[in-house]
Amino acid sequence: MIRHIYKIMIAIVCCLLAIPTEAQTKAEKNGWRLGMQSYSFHLFPLTEALDKTQELGLKYIEIYPGHKLGGKWGDKVFDFNLDAQTQKEIKELAASKGIKIVGTGVYVAEKSSDWEKMFKFAKAMDLEFITCEPALSDWDLVEKLSKQYNIKISVHNHPQPSEYWKPENLLKAISGRSHLLGSCSDVGHWRREGLNQIDCLKQLKGRIISLHFKDIAPKKAGENEQHDVIWGTGILDVKGMLSSLHGSAGAITALQNSVAHYYQRASSADYLGV
């Protein structure tokens, strides 16, 4: 029962390695790794989020900036202000559960000088990518640091007024720049902005580093936002999106914003066999 409860909160990170569960075996056929976005468990401290990730048999996690650590670290949060000893201990804790911290996000720099701090932190934590939304004026600096530290920049597409709400804007910003720079494709936000998510994925082919992969409910009268639902129960073409991603070495993350609402649902991960 616990397995089904937490699988529906899953954030799927798909890259190159396999993970030994039925759904993960399906994903392996596509060359994907499966993992967790820690915001799926934002009601719990990171120590518990790691426990739940381990219970699912997942080996990878992306941690959102500000996630409270819990345990002996109490109210300390996951960000570039963590001292070196705590960074080491968090890596060791994750490793002890067979989990690698592959990324952090969504990060938005308060000032340009913070980018160096974030890249140093990401390097110390052995992260593969930073999910973020850089200011347009910061791109030269971000590209330079990305090359210097060999860490990918995965740009998220929050809705307007975000600069990157549609693929054309991101592609313009990174045109002619390093392929260490690319997209964290949030398919739900595209649909909320009236965009066709499959067309968006096609536009970004070759530039997708990670995805926040989800399905969303139809918009109801009086609602400000279409909430996330289990894959295949909403209005997005989940099978079509997964089919369009065959052969991609990007990362897929299904981001759910509550726990209790989905206790009775089947796992979204079953769709990875598409």
Task: Say what each PLM segment does.
Residues 38-40, 76-81, 105, 128-129, ...:
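The substrate-binding groove and active-site-proximal loops of carbohydrate-active enzymes
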Residues 61-64, 101-105, 131-132, 253-256:
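Short beta-strand segments at enzyme active-site cores
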Residues 40, 65-67, 107-110, 136-138, ...:
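Active-site-proximal loop/turn and secondary-structure-junction residues that shape catalytic pockets
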Residues 63-89:
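Glycine-rich, proline-tolerant flexible connector loops at the mouths of alpha/beta enzymes
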Residues 23-38, 42-60, 96, 112, ...:
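Histidine-acidic metal/acid-base catalytic patches
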Residues 87, 93-182, 191-194, 203:
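Active-site acidic/histidine proton-transfer and metal-coordination neighborhood
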Residues 33, 69-74, 98-100, 123:
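Acidic/histidine-rich, surface-exposed loop or edge segments in extracytoplasmic proteins
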